[in-house]
């Protein structure tokens, strides 16, 4: 039987159409006992391939194809040692290290498929001389059958950024598909086929799982890690409780001893010490770390080590949700770090434990429908407008199923008939890895050399990157650490620094009032723009109903506001405000469910209920909770029987037991992690506190972090007006990339990075130019920018958006004279004639209104509109007998009252010679045109540019014409 022994999968990255499942399917369909994988240079798919082969009772043949001394070799692992050697070689290849293959490779079979290299080993074979004693039957496989050749060529075209026609005409890949026995007999000599069968009997690799391989925290210390951990925890607990020896609450002492015993028994002491160490590094270097994330916030050990900042006993959090004696997997402490400095913490880990013991984690960017259509469309030379139209009609839910997308969309059906080749090739590319990436948060650590355990390659900053993706790492004993960058922590850090710079105050967020009535009043009124977790419209509605009064309430709201639990919000609110009666099964369950008014909100409540009612131990209770969340019916059937029997033995009656079980079963899988929810609620509270008491600093930082999002920017700018904060445009005399504040004047000024087209390099150039110069008037600033090689065009933009307005010279004057100023500044010490500035028109700032379009173009908004946005709140609705309507409500039947700011007025003539006036206005932050006809031209005298009015407006022949002026604001 012929076995294809040089098969490439799509993990060769755009060099094969074959998925691992395709390899397995071919072997099964053809009743072959072996299946082979020999990807080019890498081992990305090795473990997925091995697992799936074993699951289908196939013998996996693991190989590696690579270039060596001008030859193309394929190496195969005969056994586990051979597999480890392939790992080494792949790592060396992918990190550009030179290596030498010795003749005595007992654990490998090596085949030379191209070139003339020779090894003196009985395990060496070649393909070029089919009659030589060491000939072997080998054919490169890149696609399944002849019909898929076009898909393979498309992949090559995408990879090399060429047109498909180029590969159709120049490349011969006719036989690079799976070969059957008949084809193999015609392709290869009997010697080669016999050697193939001989080799197959030698390739019997078994890949072993490995024990946990945690680096030792401090190898130089004679004290064992468990004792170091214990002493750090005891010391940390005293600090946390502000207590001396003998004064520590016994509950804490007992809980700490229990947790340490579990951690020590599982041999996780070093894991906790490593996390403690890098978090301590971060905090010691002014890097803000989140108060906790995930179930780790339920650990007292983590609290004592300052890994988390949530007291688990005070908040009744459960350690076993994080780690229990029966848990087989490693603990998982995820850490939030301010995103701007996350890389510093990761670099610390690389430096402390060494490049050979730390690695980033590989991910794959896989082709989805839209990406495949774009790639294939490009190589087929299809017009981009056509491709855009197709992609626009592929809904996100069909991004992995083009057939279904076509079936559900009429336009796609039509496009399919016009571009069948495009769609058919794209379908077969979906889910193929296009390129590799790096896991957003995770890194791995190992006490042994990582390259001795898994294959690696070069990643970010040439640091090691695993070749195996995340799901295949834990089995090899590698420790994964998730360090997540959280923008909200950076915002907090920036706000605290700005408060210190402007008010000389140092705010310790761990010592603020966590029951501040004004902060909770803000939350109850949903004043939560910019507040982590709490600013979406849906969440605001929930806050208005629930009216949180403490941190736990924030936690509950966050836990309820998810797709499943949302159904319980109404019940929760009704019970909270005593509008709905309810009862508990007994006093024991009351203690568990009372904080959430009888509703299961948290996973920890499930654990406590099961433990209390059925007398399960805490570990079994957590297993029960896991089974429900995963809907594992097999385990649930057994656990249900155990639960009922336990409850009956605990003096519960059968009907009540059944009722309780059904209730738990119905709602438990919606339960949220209490530890995580509570920890994140502290971040929400911190932001709400800073917003209430340091509004100017908070909004300034928030604006700097959201300047790329126009909608959010407008929302936050409008909110600033509600706080009576003035918003000013960027000012060259207060140059800053970010938004800046004037505390005394209650002003926030735009940062220069908000100016469209002003990237990092240009901003650095401007900053450097200003720092090197003596600055006094507008001419000295222009001179400084000129000397700093800032172009005339960019200086013109700075003028157009108002950065020179603070000199009291209007933009029109500066622009009209800019060329002359630019030419004459710095010449023999003579500057532009300053006497010209005395002209009245140079100081008439009202002409700046004509540059509103420039503000919109370069800032995304005209600054006058910010003043307009708040005027809605200043109308005396009691005196007005009408309601302000939206622009789209204007109609032909009656007047619609519209609030608008006038940006510009243009006069024209109709065909009949009548006057007509077009008012360019801003309505709900959108530009709209209103019209005044001849019979109402007298209204023009009452309207000024920049003014805000309530107009009575009607629709006539597509004209939105002004009937009257109701009020000037």
UniProtKB/Swiss-Prot annotation:
SMART domains: POLIIIAc (SM00481)
Top-level taxon of the source organism: Bacteria
SUPFAM superfamilies reported in the protein's UniProt record: PHP domain-like (SSF89550)
Catalyzed chemical reaction(s): DNA(n) + a 2'-deoxyribonucleoside 5'-triphosphate = DNA(n+1) + diphosphate
Subcellular location, principal: cytoplasm
Single annotated GO MF: 3'-5' exonuclease activity
EC number: 2.7.7.7
Key words, A-Z: Cytoplasm, DNA replication, DNA-directed DNA polymerase, Nucleotidyltransferase, Transferase
Keyword Cytoplasm: yes
Family the UniProt entry places it in: Belongs to the DNA polymerase type-C family. DnaE subfamily.
PANTHER family xref list: DNA POLYMERASE III SUBUNIT ALPHA (PTHR32294:SF0)
Record protein name field: DNA polymerase III subunit alpha
Species of provenance: Ureaplasma parvum serovar 3 (strain ATCC 700970)
